[in-house]
Amino acid sequence: TTQSDEQTPFWLVANRYGWGTLTSSNGAVIAELERSIAHDDARKWGVGYGVELAAARGFGSTLWVQQAFVEVRWRHALLTLGSKAQPMALKDGQLSTGNQALGINARPIPEVRLSLPRYWIVPFTHRWLRLKGHVAFGKTTDDSWQHDFTQGQNRYTKGVLFHSKAGYLMIGKPEQFPFSLELGLEMACQFGGKSFIRQGNQMVEIKNQSGLRSFWNAFFPSGSDATDGKFVNKEGNHLGSWVARFNYDNAQWGLSCYADQYFEDNSSMIHINKNGWGKGADAHKQVR
């Protein structure tokens, strides 16, 4: 791959957990220590951990911790503490262009994550239905970068918390039949911390809510923000995607077709004709 005119090809920065850079002259030295939890697959319980350090030139940072985590598994349930690079659930990180909601373009953040990383067979369904998913709460670590990037003159945030959750359903018996269908919902929310907003010639600091109620409002989208004003909204910045994948697998090769529908509010979660909304007083109502 070559580049010119100071333009970096998309595939050199996407799906790399923040390892992309727009600087033409760059390099990095990486030190890593990891024990994969896969070593304990034969046991009911398992333990894994890892640390990845980076020293770089031509990146946004010169020295940082890319990953630092500990994880414990009991049967199907997995608890992860710390910053770990999580793969996309229904996308191939090497072949696809990424995910619209829970992608892998950014560096991992420190979080507490409870998950079913592998499909769990739903009882009494004759192995036709399987479930997996996760729930996580964490904290963003880009405060200094935001301030430097905006030079403190445009909107930025500090100390923002992060919540993500996802659930996936597989229909099929991949061990017996080559065809299967996977359906899912992915959601994310930024909440808490402080917002710095320009009002006239000055930047105004607004403290967002970050108590236990805010965690509830992030998990079950509800509440409101101090910056909402006259607009009806929920607490935090909520977004997500409906996702689907259709699979064909055999012993030699496999083929998958997938689709996303991104949304940022309740209206976008509904599969409707985009021209089906009213005007004027009915601008936020669906018109049949």
Regions found by a protein language model. Name each.
Residues Q176-L185, F191-R288:
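Long, internal scaffold/assembly segments composed of regular secondary structure
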Residues V29-I37, A68-V72, L81, V112-R118, ...:
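Residues on the lipid-exposed face of transmembrane beta-strands in outer-membrane beta-barrel proteins
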Residues T1-E6, V47-A55, V72, L79-A85, ...:
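Transmembrane beta-barrel strands of outer-membrane/channel proteins
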Residues T23-V29, S61-Q66, A106-S115, G159-K165, ...:
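Residues that define the transmembrane beta-barrel architecture of outer-membrane proteins
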Residues T1-H39, E235:
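Outer-membrane beta-barrel initiation region
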Residues Q3-Y17, S83-M170, G184, F191-V232:
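Surface-exposed coil loops of outer-membrane beta-barrel proteins
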Residues A42-W74, P87-N105:
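Surface-exposed loop and membrane-interface regions of Gram-negative outer-membrane beta-barrel proteins
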Residues S36-V47, R73-A77, Y119-G133, M170-E182, ...:
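Short loop/turn motifs that connect adjacent beta-strands in outer-membrane beta-barrel proteins
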